[in-house]
């Protein structure tokens, strides 16, 4: 299996007095634009996920929809998983993935949860990365079940791939 972990795009700042509840914060107009460009760059990487799974939080779901549109993935096939919420245990999404029949899966979530998931997949407890908003990391699972880091691309690099 190939696993892509995607952090949501730039959202309304939680410190903004007009910001809605945490789960309802949306992408900003700039966040939508930059996420769309990053999604097109992701497509240029040759990624062809046959499953998209998102956190139920609005900003992650919006990011998943933007990536789905760039990839030609049906919006109604995006799955929602509580295991991708910010405070969840990284092992929970991996258990869920173990039942997936997909060859390539893209999961959309949040920091620090995704950084903890990256560390977990790499076999360490302490996070060693900081996935940027609309950034993507790719892991591949070996025949023996070990996860191997293939690449990590910042949103800036993803956007350049589409230039």
Give residue ranges: language-model regions.
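Active-site-proximal alpha-helix that buttresses catalytic centers in soluble enzyme cores
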Residues: 2-84, 88-91, 114, 127-134
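Short aromatic-enriched loop/helix-cap "lid" or pocket-rim segments at secondary-structure transitions
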Residues: 15-19, 92-93, 151, 161-163
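Short, well-ordered coil/turn elements that cap or connect secondary structure elements
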Residues: 73-75, 102, 144
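A polyampholytic, Gly/Pro-enriched intrinsically disordered region
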Residues: 96-106, 148-156
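Non-DNA-binding regulatory cores of transcription-related proteins
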Residues: 99-106, 111-135
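Domain-level recognition of soluble alpha/beta enzyme cores
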Residues: 122-150, 155-160
